[in-house]
Each structure stands twice: as C-alpha cells, then as structure tokens.
Amino acid sequence: ATPNFSYTAHDGSSGTLKDFRGKQNLLLVLFSWPESRVRLDQLRTASTAITTTGTAILAVPMTDLPPDELTSIAQGMPFPVITQGGREISRSYALFRRTLSIPDLFGEGTRQSHMEFLFDRFGYLRARWIPHGDGPSWTDMSLLTQQITQLNQEREILPPPGDHVH
C-alpha cells in the first residue's frame, strides 16, 4: 500500500490521500520551482479536461518554499497546491522513483525535480511519470486523459488498500 498523508492546501482545503478512495482518481504532482513551471502551466490549462474524467489534481512542492513564493505559484491554480505537509509527502513518494531491479534509476542518491503519480479511484497507485527518465509521454494531455479513461473503465478487483504502517 502507498503511504497515506495529510495535507493543507492554498485554497483552504485539507484532507488525506485516503479521502479520494471510492470517489475519484488522483494525479499527485510533486514539483520543484521554478523547474516545474512549464508543467504546472500545462496542468493549469488542461485541468478541466483532467477533472472531467473524475480525477483530482494535487500539486506538492518538493522543498519548503518561502510563503510569498508559494502564494505566487498557487495564485490562479484551479487545483490545490499543498502548503503544509509537502516535504513529508515528497520524501515518502520519492521512494517510488525506484524499481526492484534498479534501486536508483537515475544514479545513486539522485532526487528528481518533478514526478507525477496516478492513483485509481480505488486507492491504488497505477502509474508514475518522471519526465527526466520516462520521456515526454504525459506532456501529451490527450494521452494522459486516455489513460485515465481506461482506468475508469476498470472494475474493482481488490478492496481498497490498507493503511501503510512501518
């Protein structure tokens, strides 16, 4: 099971990862600033197309940003930008940059500046995109929405995952 997390966002929303289970898919966007500026603009533009597929978007800064800079980034974003809990979320999900056969895909100790994770409506992590290693695939929004549409056609085969406990 993937690590659950709590968050508070710039728009006043708050919750946990588990809140999305049984309701909608989630595109979790871990970003660095200003490195992810272009991608965040793409997501801002495509947010209506993504959310109409039953998918929420949460943007998570991978480092602690000054409050005024975070406010500037979040201004005009049609989806929540996490203001509290980002560093912990980022640290936990950075572990998913690896595979079993290659523990550090991009070199030992390398941390990526941008990663995206797609969770299905049942709470399972279904896809990961790291632009540096996976190429430009999800920059094509029609491909991303097509993959989400395919997820939406799947029926539940397992109950929601349990809590992730260490």
Task: Please state what every model-predicted region is.
Residues 103-166:
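Thiol-/selenol-based redox modules, centered on thioredoxin-like
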Residues 22-26, 52-56, 77-79, 121-124:
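Loop/turn elements at helix/coil->beta-strand transitions in domains of secreted/extracellular proteins
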Residues 15-43, 57-60:
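Short active-site neighborhood of thiol/selenol oxidoreductases, capturing the structured segment around
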Residues 93-105:
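Short, surface-exposed loop/helix-turn segments at secondary-structure junctions
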Residues 10-13, 121:
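Short, ordered coil/turn segments that flank beta-strands lining enzyme active or ligand-binding pockets
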Residues 1-6, 21-22:
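N-proximal helix/coil linker or "cap" segments that precede and/or mark the start of modular domains
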Residues 19-20, 95, 131:
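Residue-level structural signal for beta-strand termini and adjacent loop
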